[in-house]
Amino acid sequence: MFLLRPPTPAQVAAFVARSREQAPSYAETGWSLDGRTPDWARSGRHRVRVGEGEACWERAKAALRGGQMFQDWVLRPHGEASTPLSRQGATVVLLVRHFGPWGRRKWGLYSLMTNRVLYLVDEPDRYGFGYGTLPGHLVRGEERFLLERDAGGAVWFDLTTFSRAALPFSRFAQPLVGAAQRRGARHYARMLVRAAGC
């Protein structure tokens, strides 16, 4: 859903209601959990060290659960920020500003996009989730947001993706879509590291 201004609460609510009824926009759901990539998709990976120690591990988990990696790149509009990323089956709504200034009633090109939380990882040394795109998203595919703690106590954030442009114009602009995804991965990592404060 493309808009020239940030969406109203009513627009977000209607969009969410439609999205909750939709299945993911591709067949290979859950493949990112094992690092697999369908033949039609391009894969990506971005891994950074968050810090070390038990306190860092707990803060990083809280930041991931709270969606802190989305700050300043995409927003979780209005009341949708309360949608838990730690609930399998949850529909996650993101507001992407493609260009134009941030803020209410500001011009620009915005899009609402939805993803479904497909799986959770909650193990002693691994924590995270994976979500997949729903119809109307600019791409089709998955992202896995995973924290890992190694034997020395270091905490790592590992983002893996597989995707392909989904809409006619985004297929035409696949190189730009790929560049935006790589930029997004770096941004997600930077925001998560900042939020964890290790």
From Swiss-Prot:
Pfam families: DUF1990. Signal peptide: none annotated. It comes from the Bacteria. Belongs to the UPF0548 family. This is UPF0548 protein DR_2035. It comes from Deinococcus radiodurans (strain ATCC 13939 / DSM 20539 / JCM 16871 / CCUG 27074 / LMG 4051 / NBRC 15346 / NCIMB 9279 / VKM B-1422 / R1). The lineage of its organism: Bacteria, Thermotogati, Deinococcota, Deinococci, Deinococcales.
